[in-house]
Swiss-Prot record:
Keywords: ATP-binding, Ligase, Nucleotide-binding, Protein biosynthesis. One of its GO terms (molecular function) is asparaginyl-tRNA synthase (glutamine-hydrolyzing) activity. SUPFAM superfamilies: GatB/YqeY motif, Glutamine synthetase/guanido kinase. Belongs to the GatB/GatE family. GatB subfamily. It comes from Legionella pneumophila (strain Corby). Allows the formation of correctly charged Asn-tRNA(Asn) or Gln-tRNA(Gln) through the transamidation of misacylated Asp-tRNA(Asn) or Glu-tRNA(Gln) in organisms which lack either or both of asparaginyl-tRNA or glutaminyl-tRNA synthetases. The reaction takes place in the presence of glutamine and ATP through an activated phospho-Asp-tRNA(Asn) or phospho-Glu-tRNA(Gln). InterPro entries: Asn/Gln-tRNA_amidoTrfase_suB/E, Asn/Gln-tRNA_Trfase_suB/E_cat, Asn/Gln_amidotransferase, Asn/Gln_tRNA_amidoTrase-B-like, GatB, GatB_Yqey_C_2, Gln-tRNA_amidoTrfase_suB_CS, Gln_synth/guanido_kin_cat_dom. It catalyses: L-glutamyl-tRNA(Gln) + L-glutamine + ATP + H2O = L-glutaminyl-tRNA(Gln) + L-glutamate + ADP + phosphate + H(+); L-aspartyl-tRNA(Asn) + L-glutamine + ATP + H2O = L-asparaginyl-tRNA(Asn) + L-glutamate + ADP + phosphate + 2 H(+). This is Aspartyl/glutamyl-tRNA(Asn/Gln) amidotransferase subunit B. The gene is gatB. It holds the Pfam family GatB_N.
Length: 477
């Protein structure tokens, strides 16, 4: 029997605010457990929540970026459930009136296919604390530093039908929130987590099957494997004549299986009701327009613009869009440097990227400033240094040197462009290798590279290779 897979995704993106959603406690990652916890985060009586305005602005930015509806009225509600890392006994969230509804993202699939993924809602809520199972052998610790951190929960409709579609959507969303600057996207630190809701149904059927939820996945690779396992598990159950149980499951990467965590709750189980301590949020059109006018460059628009640059291929564009810092670095160089786009990108994704990877660096804190890199690439463009000399200079720039002219002067790297001097060198090489000259004239044109190499060797890489090429062709006939 053939089956259709139906997937809906819920992403929890931690917002990059300096303080929490309803308190002034810091959101910085990695602090000593419970050192960034306010009274309200700990669920202590006598304090009221105070809404973080920056979180509202970030939610509106996201809503605009996904072409969604920014609701002029949204409400915070209490989501009631018991868990050890939720000291209040409820989570402040949004249910009936979220801040953003009805958006979409376009994703790229294989064979140049595009799919529109519908985003039903994006709402604000506070994160829970964290259980520390490994800190002690005989009990579980609770760290409330994360409790109260603002989350934007982004919920798709059940419109995805394969692991490939799910992963492409998640990568597109991950890229978007980073370019917006609202989330750092650090999956290892839990800044971008995903819940997968999955069911299968007979191929072509309009009736959805019973779904299971895969909770708190924080790796694209794990998400892909978890979906594949759960698809196969559902199929085995149904083809055995049994029924899938609606439940929440956890993915175990050690043995590539999912394991039951608890029965899956329905909305009624959470007993949502408006939080009496928080006023409704009213957002007017003027506020939305002001935020819209200050949106940064976004990946979809950047990609369309870059695709109009004939010299750049998809690999180049993907590299430029690999992070907001990479794009800004490329953009700054391009504004300062007359070099061709392909020259810029070849250096950035070639030697520069190799150096960054080797030293565990990124374009966020580059060893060479964009201004210095632009000056360096300008020297190559103006043919003031050869490509072989450029590699030497680049290595010096990576160690902290900044004055390219001083390096050229000190090392004697000025490119030789004197035509008569280069012609003399070419004539010497032709006399020095008569056998190779005969072979070249007999049709072995690959030997031209040999002659160019000899000229570069004699000039210690300082000769202009284009001039050498022309002079050799002239003298070899």
């Amino acid at each position: 029997m053939e089956w259709d897979t139906v997937i809906g995704l819920e992403v929890h993106a931690q917002l990059k605010t300096k303080s929490k959603l309803f308190s002034g406690a810091s959101t910085a990652f990695g602090a000593t457990p419970n050192s960034q916890t306010s009274f309200i985060d700990a669920g202590l009586p006598g304090v009221l929540p105070v809404l973080n305005e920056q979180a509202i602005i970030m939610a509106i930015q996201f809503g605009l970026a996904i072409h969604g509806t920014i609701n002029d009225l949204s409400v915070f509600e209490r989501k009631n459930y018991f868990y050890s890392d939720l000291p209040k006994g409820y989570q402040i969230s949004q249910y009936q009136k979220p801040i953003v509804t009805n958006g979409y993202l376009n994703i790229q699939l294989g064979n140049n296919l595009e799919k529109t993924v519908h985003i039903a809602r994006a709402h604000l809520e506070e994160d829970a604390g964290k259980s520390l199972h490994d800190a002690h052998t005989d009990y579980t610790g609770i760290d409330l530093n994360r409790a109260g951190t603002p989350l934007l929960e982004i919920v798709t409709t059940p419109c995805l039908h394969s692991a490939e579609e799910a992963i492409n959507y998640l990568k597109t969303l991950h890229q978007l929130v980073r370019f917006l600057g609202i989330c750092d996207g650090n999956m290892q630190e839990g800044s971008f987590r995903c819940d997968v809701n999955l069911s299968i149904k007979p191929k072509g059927s309009s009736v959805l099957g019973t779904r299971t939820e895969l909770k708190n996945l924080n790796s694209f690779r794990f998400i892909e494997k978890a979906i594949a396992f759960e698809q196969a598990r559902h199929q085995d159950i149904l083809e055995s004549g049994l029924s899938v149980i609606q439940e929440t499951r956890l993915y175990n990467p050690d043995n590539n299986t999912t394991q039951a965590m608890r029965g899956k709750e329905n909305e009624n189980d959470y007993r949502y009701f408006p939080d009496p301590d928080l006023l409704p949020i009213h957002i007017d059109k003027e506020q939305i327009e002001a935020i819209k006018n200050n949106l940064p460059d976004l990946p979809e628009a950047i990609s369309k613009e870059l695709k109009n640059t004939p010299s750049l291929n998809d690999e180049d564009i993907n590299f430029i869009l690999s992070s907001p810092d990479t794009y800004q670095y490329y953009k700054k160089i391009k504004s300062l440097c007359p070099a061709a786009d392909k020259t810029i990108i070849n250096w950035l994704k070639g030697q520069y990227a190799a150096f960054l990877n080797e030293h565990n660096l990124t374009f966020e804190t580059p060893p060479i400033s964009a201004k210095t890199m632009a000056a360096f690439l300008s020297k190559i463009h103006e043919k003031k240094i050869s490509s072989s000399i450029a590699k030497n200079i680049f290595s010096m720039l990576c160690t902290g040197e900044k004055d390219i002219d001083a390096i050229i002067e000190r090392e004697g790297y000025q490119q030789q462009n004197d035509n008569s001097a280069l012609e003399e060198i070419v004539e010497q090489i032709i006399k020095q290798y008569p056998e190779q000259v005969t072979e070249y004239k007999a049709g072995k044109e690959k030997l031209l590279a040999f002659f160019i190499g000899q000229a570069m060797k004699q000039t210690k890489g300082k000769a202009n290779p284009e001039q050498i090429n022309l002079l050799l062709k002239k003298h070899l006939g």
